[in-house]
């Protein structure tokens, strides 16, 4: 006959686990199953096997209860951490005797780390793909760009300047492209000083013409395109405020396309002379960097002709410094622009709460025609 005490190490943890799960640890003498809703105890109910099996089950339960009581009186209650976890329970869960937060927090932290590493890997892959596309495009059109630059260089000086001015006018419209290419080409062909002067004059003329044309003919088209962009809508609202010129200058340093910025600012009520001055001031840092980059590309031909290792090193260092400085300027401009947008919107909300929107003084900031977009009202002229 099997000794009933041999099953005690298996019976005891399960019984104590049940007691710890319900939150109540009873005394050994009072250890008894719960009563049912009808008031009968669970061992009084007859199982399907009949009365004989019920009597055997009752005797086994009584023997186990006696052994359990004797064991508890001698050794005491075990610690909660020694109890086995139920099937499917996490470490640190309710059935293991520990805190439920520990296991769940570990799983969540692991998942967040995995997601963060996945996002980082995706960003790295995207940067590599974009870099590969840029180098491939440069390799494909390098010969054509070289022939084009040589053709422009062979032209008369005045004709070449007029050609650059026409190019800056074209890229100043919303659908134009190639603003940075023209800047680098001007520095490449005319040097740092003359190329810089050509850039300033050409961009000023192109900005003026694009502003007037978009304001007279393309206001509805520009407003329809802006309504789906929260960032451009916020820029317009801030430009309509008191710090509009600062926002215009900061926006010129952001990666927003040059022609698109001209179209966006054309539907505001910023005075044209002030707008041109703020645009020129905002574009000046990137123009300096692009002109210097074009001048560096001019020196690349001398480096290749000399086949000097130190020349290659200096050229690569100049390129890296120029690109890094450009990224830093753009990043700082984005931070300042976002701060200006937040500050102006908070000021606008405060003024609306105070009732300044009905100011009879005729302030141009509140007495404008308003277009209702999906993201809110955008003031335009």
Curated annotation (Swiss-Prot):
* Chain residue ranges for the region called VTT domain: 187-297
**Where is this gene product found?**
Membrane; Endoplasmic reticulum
What residue spans carry the region label Disordered? 1-50
GO biological process: one example: regulation of cytosolic calcium ion concentration
Q: What is the topology of this protein in the membrane according to its UniProt annotation?
A: Multi-pass membrane protein
Cite the record's tissue specificity text.
Answer: Liver, testis, kidney and muscle.
| First-listed, main subcellular location of the protein, grouped into a coarse class | membrane
Q: Where is the composition biased (Basic and acidic residues)?
A: 37-47
Q: What happens when the gene is disrupted?
A: Mice exhibit increased bone mass due in part to impaired osteoclast formation. Bones show reduced osteoclast numbers. Increased osteogenesis and impaired adipogenesis observed in bone marrow-derived stromal cells.
User: Which InterPro entries does the record match to this protein?
Assistant: TVP38/TMEM64, VTT_dom
Q: Which residues form a coiled coil?
A: none
Cysteines paired by S-S bonds? none
Span-the-membrane segments of this chain are: 52-72, 85-105, 121-141, 161-181, 189-209, 310-330
Per the record, its GO cellular-component terms are: endoplasmic reticulum; membrane
Pfam families tied to this protein = VTT_dom
Free-text note on domains in this protein's UniProt record: The VTT domain was previously called the SNARE-assoc domain. As there is no evidence that this domain associates with SNARE proteins, it was renamed as VMP1, TMEM41, and TVP38 (VTT) domain.
What does this chain do?
Positively regulates TNFSF11-induced osteoclast differentiation. Acts as a regulator of TNFSF11-mediated Ca(2+) signaling pathways via its interaction with SERCA2 which is critical for the TNFSF11-induced CREB1 activation and mitochondrial ROS generation necessary for proper osteoclast generation. Association between TMEM64 and SERCA2 in the ER leads to cytosolic Ca (2+) spiking for activation of NFATC1 and production of mitochondrial ROS, thereby triggering Ca (2+) signaling cascades that promote osteoclast differentiation and activation.
Oligomer and partners: Interacts with ATP2A2.
- Protein known as: Transmembrane protein 64
Q: Which gene encodes it?
A: Tmem64
């Amino acid at each position: 006959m099997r000794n009933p005490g041999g099953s005690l190490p298996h019976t005891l943890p399960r019984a104590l686990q049940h007691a710890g799960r319900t939150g109540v640890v009873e005394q050994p003498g009072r250890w008894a199953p719960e009563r049912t809703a009808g008031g009968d105890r669970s061992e009084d109910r007859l199982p399907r096997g009949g009365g004989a099996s019920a009597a055997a089950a009752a005797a086994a339960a009584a023997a186990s209860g006696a052994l359990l009581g004797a064991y508890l009186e001698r050794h005491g209650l075990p610690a909660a951490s020694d109890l086995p976890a139920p099937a499917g329970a996490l470490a640190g869960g309710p059935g293991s005797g520990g805190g439920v937060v520990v296991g769940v927090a570990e799983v969540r932290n692991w998942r967040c780390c995995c997601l963060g590493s996945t996002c980082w890997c995706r960003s790295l892959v995207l940067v590599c793909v974009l870099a590969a596309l840029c180098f491939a495009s440069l390799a494909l059109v390098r010969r054509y760009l070289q022939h084009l630059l040589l053709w422009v260089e062979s032209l008369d000086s005045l004709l070449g300047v007029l050609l650059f001015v026409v190019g800056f006018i074209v890229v100043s419209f919303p659908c134009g492209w190639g603003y940075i290419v023209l800047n680098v080409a001007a520095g490449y062909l005319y040097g740092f000083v003359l190329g810089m002067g050509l850039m300033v004059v050409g961009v000023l003329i192109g900005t003026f013409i694009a502003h007037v044309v978009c304001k007279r003919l393309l206001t509805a088209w520009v407003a329809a395109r802006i309504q789906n962009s929260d960032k451009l809508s916020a820029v317009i609202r801030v430009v309509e405020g008191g710090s509009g010129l600062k926002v215009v200058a900061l926006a010129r340093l952001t990666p927003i396309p040059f022609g698109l910025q001209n179209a966006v600012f054309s539907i505001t009520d910023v005075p044209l002379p002030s707008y041109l001055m703020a645009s020129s001031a905002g574009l000046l840092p990137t123009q300096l960097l692009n002109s210097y980059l074009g001048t560096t590309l001019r020196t690349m031909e001398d480096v290749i002709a000399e086949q000097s290792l130190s020349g290659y090193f200096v050229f690569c260092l100049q390129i890296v410094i120029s690109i890094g400085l450009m990224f830093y300027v753009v990043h700082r401009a984005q931070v300042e622009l976002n701060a200006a947008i937040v500050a102006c919107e908070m000021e606008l909300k405060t003024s609306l709460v105070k009732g300044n929107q009905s100011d009879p003084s005729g302030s141009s900031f509140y007495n404008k025609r308003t277009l209702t977009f999906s993201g809110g009202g955008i003031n335009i002229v």
